[in-house]
């Protein structure tokens, strides 16, 4: 006749299976939870806004920043894309906007601002953050005002306009710092207990169009 496993062996097997199940739960928890932890200051803004934009947008707590507390949920595209703007800006700056896209295929956060460089001519600076790749892309275009604004993206033409008005890559860096670091990120740190700061972004890759101009 077959020998039945002793009670002690059966108890040991139960303990082993229980331990394995516990380890599996811990691994699954880590796999799910830790990737969602913000790796940088832009992750913080993106994730906290994603949590609140349909109920009571956290960015409404920024003084002088206008955004709907509850973003409309209709429309196939715009329902995922809250957008707000500052009412007051430093001198020579226009239309400072902060926007998002929470649709997974197009995930992003952006800061865009226009700066007047001459009558009828502006720089449009865009800083886009991709939460999937943890990358910030900084770029600029020239805007020529008219009945309808025209936008110049061609890099050679953009550089030509900048040279015409004596604007250097160092100047562009200072514009970025003044708006993104000293305005948007500083405001974020004033309403949220951030682990990061305007001088310490955290784990993020930065790509700057004008880096070698």
Describe these PLM feature segments.
Residues 82, 86-213:
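Extracytoplasmic electrostatic interaction patches
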Residues 1-3, 57, 113, 159:
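Exposed boundary/loop context
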Residues 1-12:
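Short, Lys/Arg-enriched N-terminal segments with co-localized hydrophobic residues
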Residues 10-11, 39, 118, 129:
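Intrinsic-disorder/low-complexity regions
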Residues 30-116:
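N-terminal export/targeting and maturation segments
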Residues 17-33:
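Hydrophobic membrane-insertion alpha-helices, especially the h-region
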């Amino acid at each position: 006749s077959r020998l039945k496993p002793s009670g002690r062996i059966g108890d040991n097997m139960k303990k082993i299976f229980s331990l394995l199940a516990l380890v599996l739960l811990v691994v699954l928890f880590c796999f799910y939870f830790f990737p969602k932890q913000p790796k940088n200051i832009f992750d913080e803004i993106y994730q906290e806004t994603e949590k609140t934009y349909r109920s009571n947008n956290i960015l409404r707590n920024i003084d002088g920043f206008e955004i709907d507390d509850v973003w409309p949920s209709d429309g196939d595209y715009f329902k995922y894309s809250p957008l707000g703007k500052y009412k007051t800006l430093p001198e020579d700056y226009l239309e400072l906007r902060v926007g998002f896209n929470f649709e997974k295929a197009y995930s992003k956060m952006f800061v865009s601002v226009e700066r007047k460089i001459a009558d009828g001519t502006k720089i449009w600076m865009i800083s886009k953050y991709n939460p999937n790749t943890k990358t910030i892309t900084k770029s600029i275009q020239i805007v020529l005002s008219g009945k309808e604004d025209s936008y110049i993206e061609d890099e050679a033409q953009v550089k030509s306009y900048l040279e015409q008005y004596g604007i250097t890559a160092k100047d562009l860096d200072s514009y970025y710092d003044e708006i993104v670091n000293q305005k948007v990120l500083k405001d974020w740190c004033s309403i949220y207990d951030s682990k990061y700061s305007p001088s310490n972004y955290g784990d993020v890759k930065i790509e700057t169009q004008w880096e070698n101009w």
